[in-house]
Each structure stands twice: as C-alpha cells, then as structure tokens.
C-alpha cells in the first residue's frame, strides 16, 4: 500500500493505471484509452489485417505490436508440412501480414516463438503500469506485472492496429486477499482454483480483480501469472498484482525492458503503482491460504472444483435449483457419480502445458513427480513447453530427459491440447488431467473429459494412473 498525499483521492492499482491511459471521454460514449502493447497471433488477426487493407490504413504504432504463432501450430514438427490446410493458411497469412505492415513476428522457426502469454513476459514486452491487449481471452495473464491486460475481439484488434486506442467502459474493482501461507504441495494453480470455487465462474463479472495478501506476494512471477491467467474464469475483465521487487528482478535485463538510466526511472515509477492506503474496493473476497489443499475440478467449468481429499459433490445437497441442474448436467457429461472420492478417479491422458502452466517453474514442479518413475500403463502423457526459451532452459536442466525416461512425450512450444484447434486433442471418452484453464464440454476434443490440476498433480496422476494427493506418499 502507498500513503496518499493530503487532500488526494486514494486509488486502487487498477484505477491508477486506468486514469493514466484515458485519452478522451466523449459525452455519452465509452472512454477511449491508450494501448501500450498489442499482442497478436494467427487465429484472431487475419480479418483485422484484411480490414486495414480494404480501408487503406497503416498501423498507428507497429513498434508496439508483437506477433507470434501459437494456437494452431504443431508441437511435433516445426515444418509447415505438419500443419492442416487451415492452420497453414493461418500462419502463412500472419507472416505475410506482418511483412506487409512491419510487425515484429516470432514465427515457428524463431527461438523465442511460443504461446503469446508466455513469450511476451519473458521478453520484457509486458511491463508494469501498461495497458496490454490481445485477441485472446487469457490476456489477463500479463496483469501479474501490474499491467491492465485483457482480451479483445477481432474488430477491436483492427481498431487498436489502426489507432493504438480502444473504447472501454471502466470496470468495478474487487480485492481478493489470500491471507497467510500455503502448505507444501499447494501451488498457484490451487490458489486460483480455490478462489474460483469460492466465488463461482461469474463471481468476478464486471470487475477488475486485484490479487493480494501474503500468499500472493510469496508467489514467483510464474505463479502470479498462473493466478492472473484464470481471472477470466471467474468472469473478471482482468486480474492484477501490484509490482514489487519480485517483479523488478524478473524483468531486469530482458530484451524489451528499460535499460540503464531508463531502468532506474522506470522502477521508481513502478514502485508507486500500487493501491493507496484507504482506497475503497467495490467488493472484497478473503481466503485463508492454510485452508487451501491441492485442487481438482470435477465438472465442466472451473468453478466446479474440490480439494483432492474430497469427493464428487451430490447435486441433491444443492438448494439452488439452477445450480443443482448444472451439477447434474456436468456429472452426466463428465461420467462421474456423486460421492466418488477424487483419488478414485482414473485418467488415461495427461497434458502439462498451456498459457496457465507451461513455464519453467511448472515443468520443474512436474519433473519432481516424474523423476525415477514411469507413466502408468494405458496413460498417454505429453509435456509442451510454453516457449522456445522455456524449452531450451528445461533441456539445459535435463528436465526433458526426466520426462522422456518416465514415458512422457516431450513436444515443441504451442497452445497444444488446451483447445481442440490443432492436432493435439482428446478422443471422445478420454479423461485427462490437464494443467490448462478450461474444462468446458468438448474443450479438448469432442466428448473429452477434462480435470484441471496443477503440474505437480498432473505428473503424479500420470505415474499413478489416477488422481493422488501429492502431500502423501503414493
């Protein structure tokens, strides 16, 4: 918290960043805000670039636009021949658009290519106090740095490319404080799943959430990114964490971070970007970190989640008719019975990756449970690093060998099995322990059954063949 000068209005982190970016407030219309960084990929950008060409427009600030290929790329081969006809068209179109408009592109052959929400932060493109947008719903990831980051639609992508601005209504503010410290075996993924389980998948609708408290402050930047990544899964517009020394240490020396005197000046500014003492939030949610156990979803949205030592809930215990019906529908799709212990649920697929959990810390955590073990019979497990940098670092540490020797598949960077868009997808009836962010019906493939977990929980399930409590011997 920061102290407010006398007679000044106390502001939240979000309000400070918002106010610093309002360009104009036309009467009767949504405010116009400035965009500092625009991230694009091959799926949501083609129509936007086409619109610019039809209108004869150029990019307002091509140096503030960064492109990568991630959603529809192959994790088996870096060759265009490995792509489906549609995927190949998408990546080739992005390459041509970037060439035509002067946009920096990290294509499938670039050593820094990766998932947009992984490679952006590790290159220092993501900075505190900035506004960042991308045609992707999990852009909130970048809020871990104290940035205001959110997903936009394709028409908005075109608007930002042309003007470097965006019309936006100001959101309400929510503080989610996680007090105290977590126990061994509990990760950032468990924290955010517990939060969503508490407030529901629509509990954050209309809000920008600031995550705070000792448990959040103790997280690495990788952990904070995991938490902010899933802010959208509680319905929030964005998630943010105030920048601190952990943030500055992570950013120091990265390619697009300030250098020299600019660095010192930037840090001085960033240190002031935090919620003031006395600032009032529109809503406050509190959790005790000590109460959080490793989490595991049982249904078809991230809010349908319980602790690993719990059981599949019974819809009959739910008083709300709408919620009860939703639970019944979820159980029918997911193929589970009420009262089943979570540790009795067997799996046949494991996916460790996605913009939620594919960073080096995530892979290290999973490798602990893979080392010296073997993937269970009948289980297929894949590990997909989030970027070329993550892959190279993991291989330098020998993590790839640990996974391969245990029977995991070691892949190339990309969004992979998070969504059934590329070749990495589940078959009908497959049950997957996944480190991704969504467990909707068909998300990983038609008829697929997804259980969201941390990387450690996913790796443990791979070797056990079923979900286990990683806090105990298994």
Curated annotation (Swiss-Prot):
One of its GO terms (biological process) is L-leucine biosynthetic process. InterPro entries: 3-IsopropMal_deHydase_lsu (IPR004430), Acnase/IPM_dHydase_lsu_aba_1/3 (IPR015931), Acoase/IPM_deHydtase_lsu_aba (IPR001030), Aconitase_4Fe-4S_BS (IPR018136), Aconitase_4Fe-4S_dom (IPR036008), IPM_dehydratase_rel_enz (IPR050067), IPMI_cat (IPR033941). Keywords: 4Fe-4S, Amino-acid biosynthesis, Branched-chain amino acid biosynthesis, Iron, Iron-sulfur, Leucine biosynthesis, Lyase, Metal-binding. Its EC number is 4.2.1.33. It is an enzyme of class 4 (lyase). [4Fe-4S] cluster binds at residues 355, 415, 418. Binds 1 [4Fe-4S] cluster per subunit. It comes from the Bacteria. GO terms for molecular function: 3-isopropylmalate dehydratase activity; 4 iron, 4 sulfur cluster binding; metal ion binding. Pathway: Amino-acid biosynthesis; L-leucine biosynthesis; L-leucine from 3-methyl-2-oxobutanoate: step 2/4. The keyword Transferase does not apply. It catalyses: (2R,3S)-3-isopropylmalate = (2S)-2-isopropylmalate. It holds the Pfam family Aconitase. Its cofactor is [4Fe-4S] cluster. NCBIfam families: leuC, PRK05478.1, PRK12466.1. Belongs to the aconitase/IPM isomerase family. LeuC type 1 subfamily. PANTHER family: 3-ISOPROPYLMALATE DEHYDRATASE (PTHR43822:SF9), HOMOACONITASE, MITOCHONDRIAL-RELATED (PTHR43822). Catalyzes the isomerization between 2-isopropylmalate and 3-isopropylmalate, via the formation of 2-isopropylmaleate. Heterodimer of LeuC and LeuD. This is 3-isopropylmalate dehydratase large subunit.
């Amino acid at each position: 918290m920061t102290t407010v000068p006398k007679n000044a209005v106390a502001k939240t982190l979000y309000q400070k960043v918002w106010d610093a970016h309002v360009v104009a407030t036309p009467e009767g219309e949504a405010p116009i805000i400035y965009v500092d960084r625009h991230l694009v990929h091959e799926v949501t950008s083609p129509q936007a670039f086409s619109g610019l060409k039809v209108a004869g427009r150029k990019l307002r600030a091509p140096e503030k636009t960064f492109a990568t290929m991630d959603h529809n790329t192959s994790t088996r081969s870096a060759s265009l021949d490995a792509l489906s006809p549609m995927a190949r068209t998408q990546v080739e179109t992005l390459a041509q658009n970037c060439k035509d408009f002067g946009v920096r592109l990290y294509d499938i052959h670039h050593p820094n290519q990766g998932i947009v929400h992984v490679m952006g932060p590790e290159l220092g493109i993501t900075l505190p106090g900035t506004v960042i947008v991308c045609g992707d719903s999990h852009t909130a990831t970048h809020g871990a740095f104290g940035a205001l980051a959110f997903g936009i639609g394709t028409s908005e992508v075109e608007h930002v490319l042309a003007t470097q601005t965006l019309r936006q209504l100001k959101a309400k503010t929510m503080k989610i404080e996680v007090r105290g410290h977590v126990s061994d075996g509990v990760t950032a993924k468990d924290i955010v799943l517990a939060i969503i389980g508490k407030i529901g998948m629509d509990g954050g609708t209309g809000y920008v959430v600031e995550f705070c408290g000792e448990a959040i402050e103790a997280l690495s930047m990788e952990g904070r990114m995991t938490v902010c990544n899933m802010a959208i899964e509680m319905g929030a517009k964005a998630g943010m964490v105030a920048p601190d020394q952990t943030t500055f240490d992570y950013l120091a020396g990265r390619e697009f971070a300030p250098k020299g005197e600019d660095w010192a000046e930037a840090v001085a500014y960033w240190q002031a970007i935090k919620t003031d003492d006395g600032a009032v939030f529109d809503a406050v949610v509190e959790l005790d970190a000590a109460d959080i156990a490793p989490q595991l979803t049982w249904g078809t949205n991230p809010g349908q989640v319980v602790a690993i030592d719990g059981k599949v809930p019974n819809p009959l215990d739910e008083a709300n008719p709408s919620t009860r019906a939703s639970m019944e529908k979820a159980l029918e799709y997911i193929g589970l019975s009420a009262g089943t212990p979570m540790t009795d649920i067997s799996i046949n697929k494991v996916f460790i990756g996605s913009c939620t959990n594919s960073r080096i810390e995530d892979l290290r955590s999973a490798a602990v449970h893979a080392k010296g073990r073997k993937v269970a019979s009948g289980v297929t497990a894949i590990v997909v690093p989030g970027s070329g940098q993550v892959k190279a670092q993991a291989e330098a540490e020998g993590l790839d060998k640990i996974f391969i020797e245990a029977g995991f598949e070691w892949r190339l960077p990309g969004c992979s099995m998070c969504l059934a868009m590329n070749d990495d997808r589940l078959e009908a009836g497959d049950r997957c322990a996944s480190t991704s962010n969504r467990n909707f019906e068909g998300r990983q493939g038609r008829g697929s059954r997804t259980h969201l977990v941390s990387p450690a929980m996913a790796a443990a399930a791979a070797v056990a063949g079923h979900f286990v409590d990683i806090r105990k011997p298994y």
